[in-house]
């Protein structure tokens, strides 16, 4: 219980932080996005569930991820090549473009949604899993100031991959190791259920 309180308090503190980067130019970002479309589609709504939807995501969060792919703080064999030629301004512009797009909504698996909702809204007190909504909001809209991503409508497969990557310590660019600590306490079934619920959030 104490760990849950600490995580929630950390979320609140980070939520008061100001954005670290200036806003980019969405029109310039659209002009620079041709390479991105192969995986993420022209409007940022990827149809391959292994690749994230970028549409509607916080610009600050997207910029942070691009910068961390480039610095090596976040590791992905495909993205490291994609970000290599990008300047900080390019990253801000691309982030602004995708943030300006509308995410395409999807449906949750009705067999998994109830268990997923329980984890998303209440966590698991017995195992110390914090409620997802503590940092990502009740509707999954995220917290742009803290660079906590919007989750609603994201591919369930992608969410599941990322939670398992955090759990395996293969992804390590989360603030204060929060996601690694939470994912480490989650079962495969909890991960699958909450990922499906998130996909169906409107």
What are these regions (language model features)?
Residues 47-53, 67-111, 144-150, 167-201:
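Axial heme c-ligation environment in periplasmic c-type cytochrome domains
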Residues 20, 26, 30-71:
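The feature marks the first
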Residues 36-42, 94, 129-138, 194:
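The canonical Cys-X-X-Cys-His
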Residues 27-34, 59, 121-133, 152-161:
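Sequence context surrounding c-type heme c attachment/ligation sites in exported
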Residues 1-21:
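Gram-negative bacterial Sec-dependent N-terminal signal peptides
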Residues 16-33, 47-50, 100-126:
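Electrostatic cytochrome c docking/interface patches
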């Amino acid at each position: 219980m104490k760990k849950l309180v600490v995580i929630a308090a950390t979320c609140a503190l980070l939520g008061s932080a100001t954005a670290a980067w200036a806003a980019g130019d969405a029109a310039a970002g659209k002009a620079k996005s041709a390479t991105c479309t192969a995986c993420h589609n022209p409007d940022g709504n990827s149809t391959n569930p292994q690749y994230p939807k970028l549409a509607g995501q916080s610009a600050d969060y997207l910029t942070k991820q691009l910068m961390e792919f480039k610095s090596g703080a976040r590791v992905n064999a495909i993205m490291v090549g994609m970000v290599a030629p990008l300047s900080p301004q390019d990253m801000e512009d691309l982030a602004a473009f995708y943030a300006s797009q509308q995410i395409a909504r999807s449906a949750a698996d009705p067999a998994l949604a109830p268990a997923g909702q329980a984890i998303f809204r209440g966590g698991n007190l017995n195992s110390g899993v914090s409620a997802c909504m503590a940092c990502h909001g009740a509707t999954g809209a995220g917290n742009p100031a803290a660079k906590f991503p919007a989750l609603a409508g994201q591919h369930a497969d992608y969410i599941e991959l990322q939670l398992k990557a955090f759990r395996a310590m293969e992804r390590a660019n989360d603030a204060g190791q929060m996601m690694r600590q939470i994912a480490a306490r989650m079962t495969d079934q909890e991960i699958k259920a909450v990922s499906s619920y998130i996909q169906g959030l409107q």
